[in-house]
Curated annotation (Swiss-Prot):
NCBIfam families: dapE_proteo, PRK13009.1. Binds 2 Zn(2+) or Co(2+) ions per subunit. Keywords: Amino-acid biosynthesis, Cobalt, Diaminopimelate biosynthesis, Hydrolase, Lysine biosynthesis, Metal-binding, Zinc. The keyword Zinc applies. Catalyzes the hydrolysis of N-succinyl-L,L-diaminopimelic acid (SDAP), forming succinate and LL-2,6-diaminopimelate (DAP), an intermediate involved in the bacterial biosynthesis of lysine and meso-diaminopimelic acid, an essential component of bacterial cell walls. GO terms for molecular function: acetylornithine deacetylase activity; cobalt ion binding; succinyl-diaminopimelate desuccinylase activity; zinc ion binding. Pfam families: M20_dimer, Peptidase_M20. Its cofactor is Zn(2+); Co(2+). The keyword Hydrolase applies. The active site is at D68, E133 (proton acceptor). Zn(2+) 1 binds at H66, D99, E162. This is Succinyl-diaminopimelate desuccinylase.
């Protein structure tokens, strides 16, 4: 059994449901300590984190990842027990194989190989690992990033092991992510008997035209790296459940996934301009859950795409699609270049999550060449 697979099996066999770690990080730090990494355990609240670094020079290349996994749901629906870490038909099965314990194992074996091949490599190698990525993400990477900023630890390049591939390993990497803005809109009408609409003011009717305008608005057209900003309605709720009452209020939950062509403040302002045209009373509260970030083509992107070309002989597509990730904290707090590169995302968060054993070995090889491209 090769080193990557052995490490992956050891990690996957631990039921580290978010925000629990249950010893995954000890496996990692034990491995790294033998490679002369300085380990700093950082526990915030109930969340386990660690920072590890080898070297004292720049550039500083950091691998960021998480040891927590999402719940398995109904375990009876799994064909193979989610924490048995079984291999079948060339696939390693289990919760977290793709998201993202396979990446952790691949980077550990790549680091081991790189340090042995280049013991006097330039720069420094760091690891930023948390058990709070799949949950609230309040005591994990964001706290570690703030700690690193406080101690003046520079991070030049950060590779995040999130599963980025869509059809084959290496076909897509993420060089940024869109921002996320949520709005909770309350449209205020007047409750009344449904047979006497002239004595009431139906907030659902008031909402329809305004929401249609919001849905049809062109917020921006995106740019070279980002698709156009997306506006979606996720929830609409109104009424008491009976058939003869016009409701007094209607609640609507909105979401923007926005590009660098807009700021969240600009989007908030434009929403209010549109709502104000409709002359009804409303209240709106906002929750900004993530800024957009972008790593343009440059040293880190080139190191990743060239490594993929070397190992897989394919041309990689850059993407900023998908949800938010911990990469945003590292990009925004530490001002680092950030790229997400990991295995296929086809089975993540699903029953029977799995990853190809060959892909794990190839991913380790890709990570090795990224290290080589940055630090030699």
């Amino acid at each position: 059994m090769n080193k990557t697979l052995k490490l992956a099996k050891n990690l996957v066999s631990i039921d580290s449901i978010t925000p629990q770690d249950k010893g995954c990080q000890s496996i990692m730090t034990n491995h790294l300590s033998h490679l002369n990494f300085k380990i700093t355990d950082l526990k915030f609240g109930e969340v386990d984190n660690f920072w590890a670094i080898r070297g004292h020079q720049s550039p500083v290349f950091v691998f960021a990842g998480h040891t927590d996994v999402v719940p398995v749901g109904d375990e009876l629906k799994w064909h193979i027990s989610p924490f048995s870490a079984q291999v079948q038909d060339g696939m390693l099965h289990g919760r977290g194989t793709a998201d993202m314990k396979g990446s952790l194992a691949a980077m550990l074996s790549a680091t081991d190989r790189f340090v042995k091949d280049y013991p006097n490599h330039k720069g420094s190698i760091g690891y930023l690992i948390t058990s709070d990525e799949e949950g609230p993400a309040t005591d994990g990477t964001v706290k570690v990033a703030k700690y690193l900023k406080e101690i003046n630890q520079i991070v030049d390049y950060c590779l995040v092991g999130e599963p980025s591939a869509t059809n084959e390993l290496g076909d897509v990497i993420k060089n940024g992510r869109r921002g996320s803005l949520n709005g909770i809109l309350k449209i205020i009408g007047k409750q009344g008997h449904i047979a006497y609409p002239h004595l009431a003011d139906n907030p659902i009717h008031l909402a329809i035209s305004a929401l249609n305008d919001l849905c049809n608005e062109v917020w921006d057209k995106g740019n070279e790296y980002f698709p156009a900003t997306s506006f979606q309605i996720s929830n609409i709720h109104s009424g008491t459940g009976v058939t003869n009452i016009i409701p007094g209020e209607s609640d609507v939950v909105l979401n923007f996934r926005y590009s660098t062509q807009n700021t969240h403040k600009q989007l908030q302002s434009r929403v209010c301009v549109i709502l104000n045209k409709h002359n009804f009373e409303y209240q709106i509260t906002w929750e900004h859950s993530g800024y957009p970030f972008l790593t343009p083509k440059g040293k880190l992107v080139n190191a990743c795409t060239n490594a993929i070309k070397t190992v897989k002989n394919i041309n990689t597509q850059l993407s900023t699609s998908g949800g938010t990730s911990d990469g945003r904290f590292i990009a925004l707090i530490l001002k680092a270049q950030v790229v997400e590169l990991g295995p296929l995302n086809a089975t993540i968060h699903q029953v029977d999550e799995c990853v190809s054993i060959q892909d794990l070995e190839d991913l380790s090889d890709i990570y090795y060449h990224v290290l080589k491209n940055i630090l030699t």
